[in-house]
Amino acid sequence: MLPLRSRLAVVVAGALLVSGCAGPGTGSDDPAPSVSTTSSSTPSPSTEPSATEPPVDPETPTSWGPTVGELEEARDLVATWTPEQLAGQVIVGRFHGTDPAIPARMVRDLHLAGVSVTSANVADREQVLAMTSALTRAAAADGRDFPPVIGVDQEGGYVSHLRGIATEFPHFQSAGAAIAADARLGRRVTRAAALTTGLELRGLGFTWVFAPVADVTIGAADPTIGARSPSQDPRLAAQAVGAAIKGYDDAGIVSTVKHFPGHGGATSDSHDVLPKLDSTLAQIRAHDLPPFESAIRQQAPAVMLSHLDLTHVAPGVPASMAPEVYSLLRDDLGFEGVTITDSLGMGAVGGRPKPALQALKAGADLLLMPVDTATTHQIVVDAIASGEVSRERVEEAAARVVALQTWQARIAAQRPVPADVVERARAASADLLSAAY
């Protein structure tokens, strides 16, 4: 077998050669970022020219992927949609079983943005390919010329819903360990792991990956994140997350940085209860936000909001449903892309009245896995009709999602999945482990 550095060069150079031009995820490796308490990204150019400024070129990229023109076209499109179409485009549904016809029918009939695939929806490789193909056809049958959100939790380690079908990668803590051992090599193997993960997922028909985890764990007292976190050190975590975002962008798949503003300090599990995080805003900025700031600098397309009770920010309200938390992300950190909730079927938000509607009104663009997808769709339709949520808010959310899916299709078309993607993924996984341990 070739030495680690030699095999790494083959993986990175080969995959990028096949993928075509460098695009938004490329550039020199980031140095270790400083811990910032202010916004770390520059807003993208406005699509509305002033009296003294020339019009913005529609090919100008936004700070999160799509071009200004793609976003404007998405806004024009959703402005023509019915409330039923709008409501669907802000929901990523859940389904039961492994029959591809079930989620395909949901996407077509409810106009869903897409679905989240879990291990319970997976039988084997052939079934996965049949399912993702059926979902793509369903969106096209619904009149959409952009792909649906077909997402999966494939973080590496034990949160990998395609176990036995896609290549197994180590926990994301390996990325932090690799960077701690050798910063430049660590960032490269992390980026290569994300690149090959994304390419392999695309080969299976997926358009989204619910990764990377940007939570900074506090160690043994953290029952939920643990080894899913890249590090207990905010600076190491920031480097790992930034490298992963570049890799996923290179692969032409939508990544999802999670769980804002950071679940690693919570001492209870949001799958079961609503955890309280008693950190002050200053503590959150210093400990939890650096990886998210790094992701935004690297043009992260989507950020997932956590179900946490931030007692010093929005007490008693899950972060995913708190306008103050969306303001922290958008106004303070400068994020302009798609915001998505954590699963709305989790115990942290169970029992709350109309949780999806609360999240949408607070600032969510995508509502992930509500308990009952059809009922949630109708709730949003009725809320638009009654004015409980403004049509403007739903159009804003839907347009971002449409623009991002348009970007994904464009980048994926430029970067075909190589025939030897599985071999490359296995090599990248081995290299990450070797660099870490």
Pin down the residues of each PLM region.
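Preference for extracellular/luminal or secreted protein segments
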Residues: 2-9, 14-109, 351-437
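Acidic/histidine-rich, surface-exposed loop or edge segments in extracytoplasmic proteins
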Residues: 54-58, 85-90, 110-117, 177, ...
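Glycine-rich, aromatic-flanked loop segments that form ligand/cofactor-binding clefts
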Residues: 136-170, 190-214, 237-261
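Solvent-exposed loop/turn segments at secondary-structure junctions
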Residues: 96-99, 121-124, 154-159, 208, ...
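Hydrophobic faces of well-ordered beta-strands that scaffold small-molecule active sites
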Residues: 88-95, 113-117, 148-154, 208-212, ...
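Second-shell residues forming the walls of enzyme active-site clefts
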Residues: 82, 126-140, 144, 232-390
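A short aromatic-anchored loop/beta-hairpin motif
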Residues: 112-125, 132
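Active-site mouth loops of central-metabolism enzymes
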Residues: 89-100, 172-189, 273-286, 345-349
